[in-house]
């Protein structure tokens, strides 16, 4: 991990309240780096188009060395890095969207951010069918197509998608259980007893999973996913957020988080969505960003399938197998 002292101005830039991604990126186009913005006086900042007095006050107040040093030390202690939009390691697909984050906080493997990524989204209160479908697609895309699975670490479909990819990596890594019966994440009917005949594969042979948070990396939300978060990192995946440490989960952050899920991905797979589901926000982002939208058909008698089945009626591509994802 690069010395965070070299990135302290990017950390400072992320701590400014009330300054959104679009205005941050506009400032970067004018001044080049956060360090140059940091040097500006209040009078100079007030001359910048689109920056009002309240925002200027927030920029000046964020120049607090004590708070900045606290963040640097906390990040160093907890293996949290920050990558910025001017770095090669910053996801190039995400860089192309209108409101790309100026920086991303990251724990884990940043090498996968520029890989083959597919998002999986759906209901928090998913049915057993949704659970099995999420595991099935994530497991097989990771194992058979070496695709990284992107999701939001929320309850329901998100969690099962992450677990499906983690399961593929655990199975690929294992060389001790060749020929033994194991639970298969790769069967949509959750049929246990599959023989693992792919033992001996290196962990790197499988796609990983990327979790996007709507809060700082100093906490995992929901708490029940702490174990999952640890398994993601342990198995070569990564957890990222545009929000600095100390940012609590807020309902306003999650729709913004969704644009990163789709922005990082070549396309998204929708598994169960109610008629007015928040999942459909991610679909809207994906369409705006020119991403593919794949939809798993659902039970016509289930409220969890109203949104997904409507998407199919509107022309989204229906998928019933991981092999349908091209």
Which positions does each model-derived feature cover?
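Glycine-biased, small-residue-rich flexible motifs in mid-sequence functional cores and linkers
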Residues: 2-4, 77, 84-326
């Amino acid at each position: 991990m690069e010395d965070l002292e070299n990135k302290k101005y990017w950390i400072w830039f992320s701590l400014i309240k009330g300054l959104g991604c679009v205005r941050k990126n506009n400032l970067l186009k004018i001044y080049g780096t956060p360090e140059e913005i940091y040097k500006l006086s209040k009078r100079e900042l007030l001359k910048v188009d689109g920056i009002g007095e309240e925002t200027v006050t927030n920029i000046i107040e964020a120049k607090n060395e004590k708070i900045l040093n606290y963040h640097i030390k906390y990040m160093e202690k907890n293996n949290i890095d920050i990558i910025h939009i001017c770095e090669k390691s910053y996801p190039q697909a995400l860089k192309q969207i209108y409101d790309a984050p100026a920086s991303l906080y990251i724990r884990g493997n940043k090498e996968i951010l520029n890989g083959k990524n597919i998002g999986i989204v759906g209901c928090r209160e998913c049915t057993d069918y949704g659970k099995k479908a999420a595991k099935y697609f994530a497991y097989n895309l990771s194992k058979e197509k070496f695709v990284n699975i992107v999701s939001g670490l929320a309850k329901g479909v998100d969690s099962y998608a992450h677990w499906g990819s983690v399961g593929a990596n655990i199975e690929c890594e294992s060389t001790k259980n060749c020929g033994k019966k194991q639970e298969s994440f790769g069967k949509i009917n959750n049929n246990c007893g599959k023989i693992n005949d792919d033992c001996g594969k290196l962990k790197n042979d499988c796609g990983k999973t990327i979790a996007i948070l709507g809060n700082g990396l100093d906490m995992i939300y929901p708490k029940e996913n702490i174990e999952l978060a640890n398994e993601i990192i342990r198995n070569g995946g990564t957890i990222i957020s545009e929000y600095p440490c100390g940012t609590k989960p807020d309902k306003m952050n999650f729709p913004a988080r969704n644009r990163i899920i789709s922005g990082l991905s070549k396309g998204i797979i929708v598994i169960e969505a109610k008629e007015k589901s928040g999942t459909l926000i991610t679909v809207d982002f994906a369409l705006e960003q020119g991403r593919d939208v794949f939809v798993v058909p659902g039970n016509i008698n289930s409220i969890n399938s109203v949104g997904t089945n409507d998407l199919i009626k509107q022309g989204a591509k229906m998928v019933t197998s991981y092999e349908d994802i091209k």
